[in-house]
Amino acid sequence: MSRRHKAEKREINPDPKFGDLVVTKFMNAIMLHGKKSVAESIVYGAFDVVEAKSKAEPIAIFHQALENVAPHVEVRSRRVGGATYQVPVDVRPERRQALAIRWLIIAARKRNETTMVDRLSGELLDASNNRGSAVKKREDTHKMADANRAFSHYRW
């Protein structure tokens, strides 16, 4: 880490359709090789499919899915006297959001549907109903933290 300058946070503009910063972050995470327009069409296409299937506001389902996937605690490795302990720590809000976005996209890419639009919409619907592999990832993380609660006094 640099001792001189603190890295500046870049300003990101809200997405054009919903005016939501989180949707823009989601698009940027989906984007591969700088192809923003492709990422935009995937996300908006998935939102259209979600709206058609659930008859609800897609942005509300998206935020519900993110909330259901975001972890509250995680484990971090801490070396104490030759032994490495998995110490449970609370997750900062920015990291919670970043992890939720990352896990949703990874889970969507692993699904079996043919197009990314279908995969993403399926994962968003599953996550908003507390199902799917992204939610399972969150549950596993929480179980790991719960199992290592005995080492919580090693926090830093």
From Swiss-Prot:
One GO cellular component term of this record is: small ribosomal subunit
Is this entry keyworded Acyltransferase? Answer: no
Q: Which domain of life is it from?
A: Bacteria
Which keywords appear in this protein's UniProt record, sorted alphabetically? Ribonucleoprotein, Ribosomal protein, RNA-binding, rRNA-binding, tRNA-binding
Q: Which molecular function terms from Gene Ontology are attached?
A: rRNA binding; structural constituent of ribosome; tRNA binding
- A biological process (GO) annotation for this entry? translation
- Please describe what this protein does: One of the primary rRNA binding proteins, it binds directly to 16S rRNA where it nucleates assembly of the head domain of the 30S subunit. Is located at the subunit interface close to the decoding center, probably blocks exit of the E-site tRNA.
The protein, known as: Small ribosomal subunit protein uS7
